[in-house]
């Protein structure tokens, strides 16, 4: 079952490129760890999944999720465990994504160096190390960096099974990894399917032990896929609070640009736009053709690989993209909608684009390669410097964090009445009040079990639904007419572009009894 790598031996100059590869790996790790330590303000998409941790048990996380969220069960369990043991801080919630992102970069470096000649491997490592999407996903409380790690954890033994003279052990390892991977990453389904398809022809021509091991791999993968699909379907069936819309419909609507248009005549423009958009943003790129250069490098890499490398390994790298496209055709998983949804494709994109970039560089002069390396280093160093100077995703989340810091500090250990349900208000505000030292009541009610008060704060977000009936002040005055408003705190966010984002107004009123 031996299937040779792209080159069986590396030239002497690989010593230099090994050092370059190590340098890029170090830069990528430093950027990821630095961005994590800069502690960007937590934002809505992170909190919407985190809001499932306080009230749901580990078993309940296998069922419906609130706030239109979908996430693999093992990732949810790991995050809930950290939430319970390390607390609700953003650094605690982002720790697992950071570890996954750093490990993924190291595994990618190992994989690239195993597959390709020195300079091509260094280019492939650099593309992943300094790309903004893998870096940002490593510091986000979402499972995307885990998708990347799981993809590499499956590709490495799959490659070993294709290239080693005794593939049984690599295939057996893959049989153990596969069901775990499918429960840790939903897109791992594409990697698992590609692996089974690529290994089938060679396994069936091998010794009986290899065939039986392959059948075991099929069995464990089927079990993991079945469990993953069942849990995913439970989550997709979750109600969203909007009549006749569940999470699945919400996801389809939100990621509609990741599915082919109804008119077949528009399929080719849609496909080309998706393929040259964010899905290929390594090291940089954008939607609407913004990653065309990376696509061209990847195509050149495919051509180069077909001339010199293993066709089976090339199929292993390309099939996940094909399966992703097929899933988009039946509206099961978006294609090209966002780079964060396609982190499982990052190894394939970076390896092929790195090989294509290497093919473009001169074989006689070192200066073009040096210049490209310096540009890529500047991308990584510039990204780290930008994160240091502007440590936030969007200014509104800086304002939200500052507003809630002031509000929570003002409330102290007093009682707080939040005039809204948790699910109807800005989730950043809900998260902070949920973990504030103050005693908090929701939907206009006094904190449960707290009926003896002298000071009560009332928190209101303008534009959010409020409960019918008397206000907190009216209720308290009905119990004791000495209650009155004594202090007002107003927080206003004027957005830079009011047409895209409405202003946010929050009010805190202190009620005291004379």
Regions found by a protein language model. Name each.
Residues 1-15:
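Membrane-interfacial, low-structure loops and terminal tails that flank and connect transmembrane helices
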Residues 13, 17-513:
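Membrane-proximal helix-loop-helix interfaces that form the catalytic/acceptor-binding platform
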């Amino acid at each position: 079952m031996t299937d040779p790598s792209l080159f069986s031996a590396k030239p002497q100059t690989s010593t230099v490129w090994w050092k370059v590869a190590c340098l890029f790996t170090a830069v990528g790790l430093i950027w990821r760890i630095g961005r994590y330590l800069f502690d960007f303000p937590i934002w809505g998409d992170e909190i919407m999944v985190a809001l499932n941790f306080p009230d749901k048990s580990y078993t309940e996380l296998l069922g419906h999720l609130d706030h239109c969220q979908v996430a693999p069960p093992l990732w949810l369990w790991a995050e809930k465990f950290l939430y319970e043991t390390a607390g609700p801080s953003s650094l605690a919630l982002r720790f697992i994504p950071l570890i996954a992102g750093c490990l993924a970069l190291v595994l990618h470096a190992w994989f690239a160096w195993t597959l390709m000649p020195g300079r091509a491997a260094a280019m492939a490592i650099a593309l992943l190390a300094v790309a903004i999407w893998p870096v940002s996903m490593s510091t986000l409380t979402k499972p995307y960096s885990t998708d990347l790690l799981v993809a590499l954890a499956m590709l490495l033994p799959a490659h070993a099974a294709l290239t080693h003279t005794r593939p049984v052990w690599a295939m057996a390892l893959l049989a153990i990894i596969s069901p775990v991977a499918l429960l840790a990453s939903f897109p791992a389904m594409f990697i698992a399917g590609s692996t089974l398809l690529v290994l089938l022809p060679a396994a069936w021509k091998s010794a009986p032990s290899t065939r039986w091991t392959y059948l075991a791999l099929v069995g464990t993968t089927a079990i993991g896929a079945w469990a993953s699909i069942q849990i995913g379907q439970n989550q997709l069936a979750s109600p969203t609070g909007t009549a006749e819309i569940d999470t699945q419909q919400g996801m389809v609507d939100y990621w509609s640009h990741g599915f082919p248009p109804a008119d077949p005549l528009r399929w080719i423009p849609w496909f080309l736009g998706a393929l040259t958009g964010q899905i290929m943003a390594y090291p940089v790129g954008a939607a609407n053709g913004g990653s065309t250069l990376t696509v061209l490098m990847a195509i050149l890499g495919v051509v180069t690989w077909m001339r010199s490398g293993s066709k089976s390994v090339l199929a292993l790298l390309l099939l996940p993209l094909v399966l992703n496209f097929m899933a988009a055709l039946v509206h099961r998983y978006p294609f090209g909608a966002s780079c964060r949804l396609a982190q499982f494709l990052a190894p394939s994109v970076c390896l092929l684009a790195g090989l294509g970039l290497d093919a473009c560089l001169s074989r006689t002069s070192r200066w073009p390669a040096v210049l490209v390396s310096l540009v890529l280093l500047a991308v990584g160093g510039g990204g780290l410097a930008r994160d240091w100077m502007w440590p936030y995703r969007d200014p509104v989340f800086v304002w939200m964090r500052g507003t809630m810091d002031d509000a929570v500090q003002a409330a102290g250990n007093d009682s707080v009445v939040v005039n809204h349900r948790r699910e109807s208000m800005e989730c950043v505000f809900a998260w902070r009040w949920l973990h504030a030292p103050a005693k908090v009541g929701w939907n206009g009610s006094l904190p449960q079990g707290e009926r003896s008060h002298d000071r009560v704060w009332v928190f209101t977000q303008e534009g959010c639904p409020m409960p019918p009936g008397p206000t907190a002040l009216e209720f308290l005055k009905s119990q004791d007419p000495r209650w009155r408003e004594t202090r007002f705190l107003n927080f206003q966010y004027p957005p830079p572009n009011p047409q895209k984002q409405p202003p946010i107004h929050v009010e805190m009123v202190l009620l005291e009894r004379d």
